[in-house]
């Protein structure tokens, strides 16, 4: 092949590799990712975001109390973890309304749980456990803080409403504690019962009606299959992909009015179900969590691989409001801040619950020593997630949270006169996902395309360089062949200069000498 043609081929390959594969394709790919992430009405992403077809893994672990009477007498609590009670959790966003003026949409959240015995490791929900009666203890705690003079009334009301309990612990089946409910009898006509029940009825989201004047109390029952009242407004990300999913309002308010001064009331991050793509190691994963009335951030920790896909591993915790100035607004009061990885939720949920990581992971040692049976472990009890950085797809995520009550001696309540002081764990939950093979396959298809383009880039660049080099070499080789070689003939001494045999002028210059010298 002629050098010129080889040069054209080599240059074309080189130009294709550099201009198309190396320069044009990456921006095109990024633009497509940005476009696909937007929550545009009718798009595939909008459908997945609003009604994810695959359930989340929802695991509940209860702490069984093995020495309830001894605790009542003042001894240290001994606990035994029982779980997981595994539930398939379906989350739907309902009553969606688009707001074109600011590229946002509003929705309510609906969560539904279905018990999955095949993944509950032999547990059925029929197991009888002894646990703190959260409703009784919450009533005691709130009365002490808000109306301590009413403790006498509360004593009488507890006897009537809960049928003269022997302790603040209750023996019940796991399914009753979690979803089916424990009985609350508000049929009494006495003043004490009527007064306390009127307060309980105001919190209708915590009780399920079970006939006239009768209710059922459980940890999750009232929320199961129910559209939650919070109206959440998020950005769609059509105008700016970085804004996708960001929370801007809850119930028409642009910030909370729960916490003290500072940024604690601000809505930071997304609604935790979608995140902006093209992550870097410097980006935090920030989301607003309505169940604890605050935003939380997860930070890059390491590079990982999930199901054959390269991911970024992130970790999160509850912070330390006692030592971090920007978190002090989460303190119940300026002089009553909890320490690291503990958060008082009283203002948020209306019950004196304290959030922590499971088994008090990362909390001060003194709280761990208040009870027996806790064994914190980072891998099993930490908050962690793995994101594919280009699409911000969570391939694996584990959100874990424990709920506790701070208990102590209450002289004016007969069942707690000798109670030990302790941070008492009640239960902990893990909400997680390991992305299914169907969705992983789609991701791998994208990365296979990227790999093919990457291969084409280097193949065309290397091939183009080699072909261009070969063309240049061939060109110079042919150039050398076309040179006229002149050999100098030097006659030896005494020899007569002669032309070679049969050589004439015409044979030397046949192409240069015209056949007819008189042609002109």
Curated annotation (Swiss-Prot):
GO terms for biological process: sensory perception of smell. One of its GO terms (cellular component) is cytoplasm. It is found in: Cell membrane. Disulfide bonds join 264-329, 293-348, 331-337. It comes from Apis mellifera (Honeybee). The keyword ATP-binding does not apply. GO terms for molecular function: scavenger receptor activity. This is Sensory neuron membrane protein 1. It is a multi-pass membrane protein. Glycans are attached at residues 64, 224, 268. Belongs to the CD36 family.
């Amino acid at each position: 092949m002629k050098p010129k043609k080889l040069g054209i081929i080599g240059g074309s390959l080189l130009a294709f590799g550099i201009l198309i594969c190396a320069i044009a394709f990456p921006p095109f790919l990024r633009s497509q990712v940005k476009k696909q992430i937007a929550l545009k009405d009718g798009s595939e992403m909008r459908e997945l975001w609003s009604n994810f077809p695959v359930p989340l893994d929802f695991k509940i672990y209860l702490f069984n109390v093995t020495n309830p009477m001894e605790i009542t007498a003042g001894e240290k609590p001994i606990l035994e973890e029982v779980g997981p009670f595994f539930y398939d959790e379906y989350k739907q966003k309902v009553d969606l309304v688009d707001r074109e003026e600011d590229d946002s949409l509003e929705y309510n959240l609906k969560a539904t749980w279905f018990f999955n015995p095949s993944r509950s490791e032999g547990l059925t929900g029929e197991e009888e456990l002894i646990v703190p009666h959260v409703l009784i203890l919450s009533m005691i705690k709130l009365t002490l803080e808000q109306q301590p003079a009413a403790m006498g009334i509360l004593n009488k009301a507890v006897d009537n409403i809960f049928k003269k309990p022997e302790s603040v612990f209750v023996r019940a089946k796991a399914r009753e504690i979690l979803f089916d409910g424990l009985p609350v009898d508000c049929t009494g006509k006495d003043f004490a019962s009527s007064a306390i029940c009127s307060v309980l009825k105001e919190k209708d989201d915590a009780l399920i009606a079970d006939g006239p004047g009768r209710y059922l109390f459980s940890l999750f029952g009232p929320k199961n299959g129910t559209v939650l009242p919070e109206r959440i407004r998020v950005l769609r990300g059509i105008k700016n992909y970085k804004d996708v999913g960001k929370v801007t309002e809850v119930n028409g308010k642009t910030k909370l009015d729960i916490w003290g001064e500072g940024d604690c009331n601000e809505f930071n991050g997304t609604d935790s179900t979608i995140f902006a793509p093209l992550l870097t190691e410097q980006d935090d994963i920030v989301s607003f969590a309505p169940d604890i009335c605050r935003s939380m951030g997860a930070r890059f920790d390491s590079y990982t691989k999930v199901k054959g896909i390269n991911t970024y591993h992130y970790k999160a915790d509850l912070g330390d409001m006692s030592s971090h100035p920007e978190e002090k607004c989460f303190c119940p009061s300026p002089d009553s801040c909890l320490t690291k990885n503990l958060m008082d939720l009283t203002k948020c949920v209306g019950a004196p619950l304290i959030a922590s990581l499971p088994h008090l992971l990362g909390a001060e040692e003194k709280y761990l020593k208040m009870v027996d049976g806790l064994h914190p472990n980072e891998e099993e009890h930490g908050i962690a997630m793995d994101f594919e950085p280009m699409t911000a797809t969570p391939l694996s995520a584990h959100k874990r949270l424990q709920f506790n009550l701070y208990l102590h001696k209450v002289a004016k309540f007969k069942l707690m006169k000798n109670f030990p002081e302790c941070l008492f764990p009640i239960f902990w939950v893990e909400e997680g996902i390991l992305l299914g093979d169907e969705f992983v396959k789609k991701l791998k298809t994208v990365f296979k395309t990227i790999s093919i383009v990457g291969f084409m880039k280097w193949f065309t660049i290397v091939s183009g360089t080699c072909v261009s080099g070969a063309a240049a070499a061939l060109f110079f080789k042919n150039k050398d062949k076309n040179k006229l070689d002149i050999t100098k003939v030097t006659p030896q001494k005494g020899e007569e200069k002669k032309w070679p045999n049969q050589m004439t002028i015409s044979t030397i210059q046949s192409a240069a000498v015209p056949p007819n010298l008189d042609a002109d």
